[in-house]
Each structure stands twice: as C-alpha cells, then as structure tokens.
Design a protein with these regions (language model features):
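N-terminal Rossmann-like NAD(P) cofactor-binding module of classical short-chain dehydrogenase/reductase
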Residues: 1-3
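Predominantly a Rossmann-like dinucleotide-binding segment in NAD(P)-dependent oxidoreductases
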Residues: 51-154
Length: 154
C-alpha cells in the first residue's frame, strides 16, 4: 500500500507510479491541481478498478460520526426534501516557513506549498473540497450549477 500525502501538485504522477506498480493507494485530497492532473488520476483510477486495486481519498468528513448521522437521517427521509444548499470555508492562513538565505526559490516553495497554486491549487481546492464533498454526499448527486467567490492573492 502507498500513502500519498505529498503536495497535491505531485499526486497525479505519484498515483500513476503507484498504480503501475500494482499498489493499493490512500491519497490525500485534492488529488490534483489542474485539468491534466485530474485526467491522469481518472485514467489511473480506471486502471486501478480493472486491476482490483483499492484507492481511497482522504475526504475525512465521510468518517466523522456527526456527518454520518446526518447523512443517515437524510437517507431515511427524517429531514424532508433538500431543495438547495450553501457550503462555506472561512479560514485564515496556515503555517508559513520563513525564507532562509540559503534556500533556493524551489525549496522555499516546496516548504510553503500551501501558498503556491501550482502545488496546492488554492484554498478552495485544498480545504473547501471537504464541504463540497459533504454537499454532494448529502444530496446524493452532483450539482447542475455552482457559484464560488474568494481569493487569497489579492
């Protein structure tokens, strides 16, 4: 089994290598930061399924007791029809590793990957994905329309 907890920008390549090596995979979310990465992950996930390799993504809320209970209540029609919803992610910054004089730009970005879109995606991709996943899970389908706003690079 391979556990992928590297920065998301590298995950599609690591996932591809693990699947080609015949390994089962747990990988953190997000699984990629761009469309080519997503395409690679989808392709390799199909191969993994054909080869009966297990792949699990770290969408943690699906394993939290209170979320499981709410999902069960929704499935058992205890809350009525859900006709719309909103999900939010509000957060301040996370860790920052100050630049050291001897560091290259690449090393600095690697150590602070959360702040570089090519490595992280952005805070919506990196963190808000949990709330988007919960909305899809509770509704039981994917949205036909969505809207988002925010920013970190302002």
């Amino acid at each position: 089994m391979v556990i992928l907890t590297t920065p998301p920008g590298f995950r599609p390549h690591h996932f591809e290598y693990a699947i080609q090596a015949g390994k089962h995979v747990f990988m953190e979310k997000p699984v990629a930061t761009d469309v080519p990465g997503i395409r690679k992950v989808l392709k390799m996930a199909k191969i993994a399924k054909e080869n009966k390799q297990n792949v699990v993504v770290g969408l943690q809320r699906r394993y939290q007791k209170n979320y499981i209970e709410i999902a069960s209540q929704i499935r058992d029609d205890k809350v009525g029809d859900i006709v719309s919803g909103q999900v939010y992610w509000n957060s301040a910054g996370v860790w920052v590793h100050p630049r050291k004089p001897e560091q290259t730009e690449m090393e600095y970005q690697m150590r602070n990957w959360y702040y570089f879109n090519w490595l992280c995606g952005d805070h919506i991709l990196e963190q808000h994905i949990h709330n988007i996943d919960v909305a899809n899970w509770f509704i039981g389908e994917y949205p036909i329309a969505a809207q988002g706003m925010g920013g970190r690079e302002v």
